[in-house]
A protein has these predicted regions:
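Alpha/propeptide regions of enzymes that mature by internal proteolysis
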Residues: 1-229
Length: 229
């Protein structure tokens, strides 16, 4: 059980991210760092810090098109360390310009989405899957809830995020379910003695509905002007 923490923030800056800039491979690149500190549990599919665990920060880093490094987790960890992020965290990467991220909020839940959709398609494709990590193109979704969720609810929240993403893509006229490298990170407060731990985060639960709406709006706002195919 974590140490006693201040009441969760439900104001407009729950996901208060810092935009960082660096030059790498001759390109000017950006990264978004959210560093809320202790007291957060995250469920993520990210290459760095994925799974379910307490995490202290989330980094969403832009990398160059044609990225060829074979150690993305180490690369992300080095970037986070250089930015002053201590402890363990979550690292996502994308070739999209993360400084153009879209944000949305609903009832205390917040979502930040960066989107690059040049390589997109349907999840159930007849093509054989490749081995290893795919090239970063990617819709990256980071969402935060000001309440505690059980492990099952965190997994449920990732499902809700994915469903809301696909809904937004279809409503935008895009004939796809996403890109092959999409990543998700859902953050919720760590459980405290005597505080409620929510067991559900599906799209018809109280907090899941808020999560779905915030992600849906953020994905819609993040999509570049691309002709449907």
């Amino acid at each position: 059980m974590s140490a006693l923490l201040p009441p969760p923030r439900t104001g407009p800056r729950l996901l208060n991210q810092e935009c960082l800039t660096r030059t790498e491979d001759g390109e000017r690149l950006h990264a978004l760092l959210w560093h809320p500190g202790p007291g957060w549990r995250m469920a993520s599919s990210a290459v760095l810090g994925g799974g379910i665990a307490e995490r202290a920060w989330v980094l969403n880093a832009q990398v160059a098109h044609g990225y060829r490094r074979t150690d993305p987790a180490r690369h992300l960890a080095d970037l986070a360390r250089a930015a002053g992020a201590g402890g363990t965290g979550v690292g996502l990467m994308t070739a999209a310009d993360v400084s153009a991220a879209a944000r949305a909020r609903d009832g205390g839940v917040e979502a930040v989405v960066t989107a690059g959709i040049s390589v997109r398609g349907w999840a159930a494709s007849p093509e054989e899957g490749a081995t290893g990590a795919g090239a970063p193109g990617t819709i990256n979704i980071v969402a935060a809830l000001p309440v505690a969720l059980s492990d099952a609810a965190l997994v449920n929240a990732v499902m809700t995020v994915t469903e809301a993403k696909v809904q937004a893509l279809l409503e935008s006229g895009l004939d796809c379910s996403g890109t092959p490298t999409d990543a998700v990170c859902v953050a919720a407060r760590a459980p405290q003695d005597g505080a409620e731990v929510h067991s559900f985060a599906g799209p018809r639960s109280e907090w899941g509905a808020r999560l779905a709406r915030s992600v849906h709006r953020a994905v819609l706002g993040s999509l570049p002007a691309v002709a449907p195919r």
